[in-house]
Amino acid sequence: MAQVKRIRRNVSGIILLDKPLGFTSNAALQKVRWLLNAEKAGHTGSLDPLATGVLPLCFGEATKFSQYLLDSDKGYETLAQLGKTTTTADAEGEVLQTREVTVGRADIEAVLPEFRGEIKQIPPMYSALKRDGQPLYKLARAGEVVEREPRSVTIARLELLAFEGDTARLAVDCSKGTYIRTLVEDIGEKLGCGAYVAELRRTQAGPFSLAQTVTLEELEAVHAEGGNEAVDRFLMPSDSGLLDWPLLQFSEHSAFYWLNGQPVRAPDAPKFGMVRVQDHNGRFIGIGEVSEDGRIAPRRLIRSE
């Protein structure tokens, strides 16, 4: 008997998941996609299986704006295990070296300023960055080590929250592309004892915080009671991650031409940058960029939601 193909639903919006421990970001995405029975889905930047916390999941029209969330600043809390280094710079790797921990709170506080502001990081071998089309982590698993260029990242906040014995809990606010594993490893080397990430929790992703998230268990419970459509109540509007952008409202006439790819003028437009756009009914219809001539050029459009 032929298997009936599941017809997926055309749903749009963002679900802020508190990613559970042990899940890859894609596995978490596919699980929530199944609960929604959503046609189109994508996430906004991977969290390691070891990590938990804020993972914005985009569905339908919201996937058009996922890159802007991917580029946003992030916040983390991490538990650094001092005295050991591992192959992966986290608890999943094999121990490479063990050293005595003779540092105290004051020693840690003294080195943290060196890692604030704009710093250079060498990406870890166990990362999704690619070399000749191959992810570095695959090369690392095969025992290969390749040269990686240092990258500039910005650490806006680096604070010692707690110190006990051989562990230090840190709060980090950082730019996109920052590797917390590398940061912790570098701090450990500066202290002379080595360190790796024992725990990692993302507390912020762009404008989104942990307080706004929903757990997988909560989604599953709602789905068990009411099916796919019951999960829709957790969907946030597609432009939720862009609320700090200037908002313009077009007339019916301007919206028509803009949705057909034509740049238009708006009296309240800023002099430059990206903007969110609503039609005359207050419906979000996409994002645009202010051109040199002052017109708003369409960049990503939503025709209906």
Curated annotation (Swiss-Prot):
Q: Which CDD domains match?
A: PseudoU_synth_EcTruB, PUA_TruB_bacterial
**What's the domain of life for this entry?**
Bacteria
Q: Has keyword Isomerase? A: yes
One Gene Ontology BP term is: tRNA pseudouridine synthesis
Which residue positions are annotated as catalytic?
D48 (nucleophile)
- Kindly list the GO molecular function terms attached to this UniProt entry: RNA binding; tRNA pseudouridine(55) synthase activity
Question: Does this entry carry the keyword tRNA processing?
Answer: yes
> What is the reaction catalyzed?
uridine(55) in tRNA = pseudouridine(55) in tRNA
Please give the family membership noted in the entry. Answer: Belongs to the pseudouridine synthase TruB family. Type 1 subfamily.
Specify the protein name.
tRNA pseudouridine synthase B
- In which organism is this protein found? Pseudomonas fluorescens (strain ATCC BAA-477 / NRRL B-23932 / Pf-5)
- Gene name, per UniProt, is truB
